[in-house]
Amino acid sequence: MSLSVVISTKKIDKEFISILEKSSGVYKIEILPYENNGEHSLTEIYNMGLKDSTNEIVLFCHDDIKFDTKNWGRKLLNHFKKSDYGIIGVAGCRYLPTSAKWWELPPEMMGQVYHENEGKRWLSTYNRKFGSDILPAVLVDGLFFGINKNRIKESFDESIPGFHFYDLGFCVQNYLKGVKIGVISNIDITHLSMGQTNQEWEQNRINFSKRYKDSLPLLESIKFKELKFKKNKPLVSIIIPVYNYGKTLDTALTSVFDQTYQNLEIIIIDDGSTDPFTKLKLDNLDIPNTKIIRQKNGGPSNARNEGVKICSGEYILPLDSDDIMLPTYVEECVNTILRDKTISPVYCDTIHEGEMKGVEKRPEWSKERLIQGPFIVNCSMFSKEAFDSIGGFDESLKGWEDYDFWLRMMQKGYIGKRIAKPLFVYFHHEKEGTVSTIANQNMSELHKKILVKNKLIKDIPAYQPLKNNNSGFNIFT
């Protein structure tokens, strides 16, 4: 198996062609440079390349890139040889909205591309490296993409003029006919110029959106591997409430499937989402060991309670759809909670991301400290037995329901245990006005209300809320 490379360029650069030949690692590679100063659209040039190329595998790439990976051609050929993909690139996305702006939702973008411009070099990274795997996509960027001529269904759409949307047009028309499209991460490319969204780009976008209005949006879901269950290990139920945060759900789910402890069931509660993307995401989920429940909006406490009602796990771990766990978190929680039946919850230190950044060391658990104020992360493990003993989360509370939950667990004789490691990542969205953000603005009032509810304040008039400490994270000192 050999490789053909098609390039559209204003002036044929023999040095660039030599670099292609030497760096590819492919014997008798075929280079097809087409000199083009605007006489032809890119779709016309690329169709010429499809016709003129003698090899089954054809690479289309810009003439302003550097190949940072040795034997990149051999790697590309190997991807096609070991898979049934028809189109493969180094950057792309799983979601194409009706606007045709494929970068609208960064969590759905994939790949890594270096950029070099005006003496500066930087890496645009949309997800971490994933070895020699191929991640399914709905389209790939035209910077660098290979095709198998025997697997594609359509050539380039010559009704698209100029140099924009040739890649989207080619990918989408093939994707809609069942051609598999994917992104790889083991070939590094440096782009030596910046993309432009000029008037031609905008007109092509409008035309593209109109043409495919009945097909957009498009979404390709992540394929997760089966969890590997071990005998004589307790089952842990991961409860994930979702309300209009589908854009981060894949990241949260990836952190679940990356766990070293695999005896897991996943329960996703769609709490009445109204966001079109979230509904599309949930409609397209196909995940092993997972139950998806749709319900009217009832709030976080109701969603967690409904999840626990149908779970089979001996232990429960709530996870918000915009947060993630580090790979050993569940395993370390299970190892801790198995030491003593009275342990609930198990919690850890926290990595903060978003509008607040840093690592927060959580206090050690004690009754006195817990009464002072909340410090246990909402993504903490507890036993189903402990949950049942207190009747679950209080659905009447609008904020700090987890704090009330831990207090009632304490009053039933359960004790908390801290894992002194940052194994949980909490993302802040203060500007978006989430329930937790609004609750924290009224923390003194909520604190007092919850203590009164649980009969933990003896002298109400003497109650004084504690001030924030200097960490910027712990609410109470």
Region annotations inferred by a language model:
Residues 39, 66, 70-113, 328-359:
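Conserved donor NDP-sugar-binding/catalytic core segment of glycosyltransferases
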Residues 6-44, 48-52, 253-294:
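Acidic donor-binding segment of Leloir-type glycosyltransferases
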Residues 198-224, 421-422, 426-429, 435-463:
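Catalytic core of nucleotide-sugar-dependent glycosyltransferases
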Residues 1-4, 234-236:
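Extreme N-terminal starter segment of soluble prokaryotic enzymes
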Residues 231-442, 469-470:
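Nucleotide-sugar donor-binding/catalytic module of glycosyltransferases
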Residues 76, 138-147, 151, 160-187, ...:
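A short, conserved alpha-helix in the catalytic core of glycosyltransferases
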Residues 323, 452-477:
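Membrane-proximal basic amphipathic "stem/tether" segments
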Residues 120-146, 363-381:
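A recurrent flexible, glycine/aromatic-enriched loop bordering the glycosyltransferase active site
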